[in-house]
Amino acid sequence: MESTEKQTWQRYLTDYNEGLGLVYERFVLNDFLLALKSRHGIQTVLEAPLFGMAGVSGINSVALAQAGCSVTLVDDHAGRLAAVERIWGELDLPARFVHHADWGQLPFPDDAFDLAWNWAALWYLSDPAALLRELVRVSRRVVFVAMPNRAQAGYLLRKYLLERDFVKYAEERWADIGRVRRVLEGAGL
């Protein structure tokens, strides 16, 4: 299970060439996050966990840091977190890095962040619903969770042709955004 995914994320901690698809996705994500910042007055950001879909781990909140937000990044893998801290150092951007493994109990008080968010990591967690409830608890304004569209051609290619083992280490039912929304609403969002 972990070996395939481990190889993928480790590669991008030193090879920043994500390919055109991921670069385009990052531009769209950055625009979306900056629009959220503007619309909701976001100044403090929590991204937990920092590992989600392919590409360079831990850089999803870079645009927010560049726009002056205080960013906190949480991950359960100490080696990955250290590498992400190095990457942020290369970018000369400040951030707070927290090693924490209990996604059902984040080490922050209620309403600690303007934005608590996650980029496609739910299906790697043993209890995704617990993390979603925690994101609601620690956010005072906005919770944003993105998951891949299971009907999108790239996803289907990955699942059935390019990386058939993917479903062995990813819990696909958490890519159902309706399911995610129901948990968030049940937590009071």
Residue ranges of model-derived segments:
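N-terminal, positively charged/glycine-rich alpha-helical extensions of SAM-dependent methyltransferases
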Residues: 1-18
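Conserved alpha-helix/loop element of class I SAM-dependent methyltransferases that forms part
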Residues: 21-48, 59-63
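Class I SAM-dependent methyltransferase SAM/SAH-binding core
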Residues: 44-105
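A short acidic, Gly/Pro-enriched loop at the edge of an enzyme's catalytic core
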Residues: 104-115
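A short SAM/SAH-binding and catalytic strip from SAM-dependent methyltransferases
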Residues: 114-127
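A short glycine-rich, Lys/Arg-flanked "PGG" loop and its adjoining helix->strand segment in the class I
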Residues: 129-144
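Conserved class I S-adenosyl-L-methionine
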Residues: 141-174
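Short alpha-helix
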Residues: 169-189
